[in-house]
Protein backbone atom coordinates (compact mmCIF):
# COMPACT_ATOMS: atom_id res chain seq x y z
CA UNK A 1 0.00 0.00 0.00
CA UNK A 2 1.08 3.57 -0.68
CA UNK A 3 -0.03 6.81 1.00
CA UNK A 4 0.07 9.86 -1.30
CA UNK A 5 -0.84 13.25 0.17
CA UNK A 6 -1.68 16.44 -1.70
CA UNK A 7 -3.74 14.65 -4.36
CA UNK A 8 -6.13 17.48 -5.15
CA UNK A 9 -4.09 18.36 -8.24
CA UNK A 10 -0.59 18.48 -9.61
CA UNK A 11 2.12 15.93 -8.98
CA UNK A 12 0.35 14.17 -6.09
CA UNK A 13 -2.76 13.58 -8.21
CA UNK A 14 -0.72 12.28 -11.15
CA UNK A 15 1.40 10.06 -8.92
CA UNK A 16 -1.65 8.52 -7.21
CA UNK A 17 -3.26 7.71 -10.57
CA UNK A 18 -0.02 6.24 -11.94
CA UNK A 19 0.60 4.04 -8.89
CA UNK A 20 -3.02 2.84 -8.97
CA UNK A 21 -2.64 1.93 -12.66
CA UNK A 22 0.43 -0.14 -11.71
CA UNK A 23 -1.62 -2.16 -9.22
CA UNK A 24 -0.74 -0.43 -5.96
CA UNK A 25 -3.34 0.03 -3.24
CA UNK A 26 -3.26 3.85 -2.99
CA UNK A 27 -4.45 5.92 -0.05
CA UNK A 28 -4.86 9.33 -1.67
CA UNK A 29 -5.12 12.32 0.64
CA UNK A 30 -7.39 14.84 -1.07
CA UNK A 31 -8.17 17.30 1.67
CA UNK A 32 -8.76 20.97 0.97
CA UNK A 33 -6.86 22.20 4.02
CA UNK A 34 -3.92 24.48 4.51
CA UNK A 35 -0.87 23.52 2.47
CA UNK A 36 1.18 22.93 5.61
CA UNK A 37 -1.40 20.47 6.92
CA UNK A 38 -1.21 18.44 3.73
CA UNK A 39 2.50 18.64 3.00
CA UNK A 40 3.92 18.34 6.49
CA UNK A 41 1.60 16.42 8.79
CA UNK A 42 -0.22 14.39 6.18
CA UNK A 43 2.97 12.67 5.11
CA UNK A 44 3.08 10.04 7.85
CA UNK A 45 0.92 10.93 10.86
CA UNK A 46 -1.68 8.21 10.49
CA UNK A 47 0.50 5.50 9.03
CA UNK A 48 3.78 5.73 10.97
CA UNK A 49 3.02 2.76 13.27
CA UNK A 50 2.50 0.53 10.22
CA UNK A 51 5.48 1.63 8.14
CA UNK A 52 8.89 0.16 7.47
CA UNK A 53 9.82 2.67 4.79
CA UNK A 54 8.84 6.32 4.23
CA UNK A 55 9.38 8.05 0.89
CA UNK A 56 8.35 11.71 0.89
CA UNK A 57 8.01 13.79 -2.26
CA UNK A 58 9.48 17.25 -1.84
CA UNK A 59 10.43 19.93 -4.36
CA UNK A 60 13.54 21.34 -5.94
CA UNK A 61 11.86 24.75 -5.72
CA UNK A 62 12.42 24.89 -1.97
CA UNK A 63 12.73 28.66 -1.77
CA UNK A 64 9.37 29.94 -3.01
CA UNK A 65 6.21 30.53 -0.93
CA UNK A 66 4.65 27.29 -2.19
CA UNK A 67 7.71 25.32 -1.30
CA UNK A 68 8.32 26.49 2.23
CA UNK A 69 6.22 23.48 3.20
CA UNK A 70 8.19 21.25 0.83
CA UNK A 71 11.39 22.30 2.60
CA UNK A 72 9.55 21.44 5.81
CA UNK A 73 8.98 17.95 4.38
CA UNK A 74 12.74 17.61 3.94
CA UNK A 75 13.51 18.76 7.49
CA UNK A 76 10.76 16.54 8.87
CA UNK A 77 12.13 13.60 6.87
CA UNK A 78 15.64 14.20 8.23
CA UNK A 79 14.33 14.14 11.81
CA UNK A 80 12.13 11.12 11.13
CA UNK A 81 15.08 9.28 9.55
CA UNK A 82 17.18 9.86 12.67
CA UNK A 83 14.41 8.91 15.11
CA UNK A 84 13.17 5.82 13.26
CA UNK A 85 16.57 4.34 12.34
CA UNK A 86 16.75 2.21 15.53
CA UNK A 87 13.41 0.64 14.53
CA UNK A 88 14.61 -0.24 11.04
CA UNK A 89 12.39 2.32 9.30
CA UNK A 90 14.02 3.82 6.19
CA UNK A 91 13.17 7.41 5.24
CA UNK A 92 13.89 8.90 1.80
CA UNK A 93 13.07 12.17 0.07
CA UNK A 94 12.44 12.39 -3.67
CA UNK A 95 12.82 15.79 -5.36
CA UNK A 96 11.34 15.58 -8.87
CA UNK A 97 12.52 18.02 -11.51
CA UNK A 98 10.54 20.96 -12.80
CA UNK A 99 6.83 20.09 -12.98
CA UNK A 100 5.51 23.65 -13.10
CA UNK A 101 2.79 22.78 -15.62
CA UNK A 102 1.58 19.89 -13.46
CA UNK A 103 1.67 21.86 -10.22
CA UNK A 104 -0.15 24.92 -11.56
CA UNK A 105 2.60 27.20 -10.30
CA UNK A 106 2.52 30.54 -12.04
CA UNK A 107 5.00 31.50 -14.71
CA UNK A 108 7.12 34.57 -13.95
CA UNK A 109 5.08 36.50 -16.52
CA UNK A 110 1.77 35.61 -14.88
CA UNK A 111 3.10 36.41 -11.40
CA UNK A 112 4.22 39.82 -12.63
CA UNK A 113 0.90 40.50 -14.39
CA UNK A 114 -1.09 39.68 -11.24
CA UNK A 115 1.02 41.67 -8.78
CA UNK A 116 -0.50 44.78 -7.21
CA UNK A 117 1.15 47.99 -8.39
CA UNK A 118 2.58 48.70 -4.93
CA UNK A 119 4.49 45.39 -5.03
CA UNK A 120 5.74 46.01 -8.57
CA UNK A 121 7.17 49.31 -7.38
CA UNK A 122 9.49 47.58 -4.88
CA UNK A 123 10.20 44.36 -6.79
CA UNK A 124 11.28 45.01 -10.36
CA UNK A 125 10.40 42.56 -13.11
CA UNK A 126 13.97 41.21 -13.12
CA UNK A 127 13.31 39.69 -9.70
CA UNK A 128 10.73 37.29 -11.19
CA UNK A 129 12.76 36.28 -14.24
CA UNK A 130 15.24 34.29 -12.15
CA UNK A 131 12.39 31.83 -11.51
CA UNK A 132 12.61 30.57 -15.08
From Swiss-Prot:
Substrate binds at residue 59. Requires phosphatidylcholine as an allosteric activator for enzymatic activity. Transmembrane segments: none annotated. GO terms for molecular function: 3-hydroxybutyrate dehydrogenase activity. SUPFAM superfamilies: NAD(P)-binding Rossmann-fold domains. The modification Phosphoserine is found at residue 104. The modification N6-acetyllysine is found at residues 17, 70. The keyword Cell membrane does not apply. Signal peptide: none annotated. One of its GO terms (cellular component) is mitochondrial matrix. Its main location: mitochondrion. The gene is BDH1. It comes from Mesocricetus auratus (Golden hamster). NAD(+) binds at residues 3-27. Homotetramer. Keywords: Acetylation, Allosteric enzyme, Glycoprotein, Lipid metabolism, Membrane, Mitochondrion, Mitochondrion inner membrane, NAD, Oxidoreductase, Phosphoprotein. Belongs to the short-chain dehydrogenases/reductases (SDR) family. It comes from the Eukaryota. Glycans are attached at residue 77. It catalyses: (R)-3-hydroxybutanoate + NAD(+) = acetoacetate + NADH + H(+). The active site is at 66 (proton acceptor). This is D-beta-hydroxybutyrate dehydrogenase, mitochondrial. It is found in: Mitochondrion inner membrane; Mitochondrion matrix. Gene3D superfamilies: NAD(P)-binding Rossmann-like Domain. Its EC number is 1.1.1.30.
Amino acid sequence: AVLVTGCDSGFGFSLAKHLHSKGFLVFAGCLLKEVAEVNLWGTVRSFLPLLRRVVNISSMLGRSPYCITKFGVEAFSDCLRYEMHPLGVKVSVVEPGNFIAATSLYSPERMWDELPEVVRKYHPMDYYWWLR
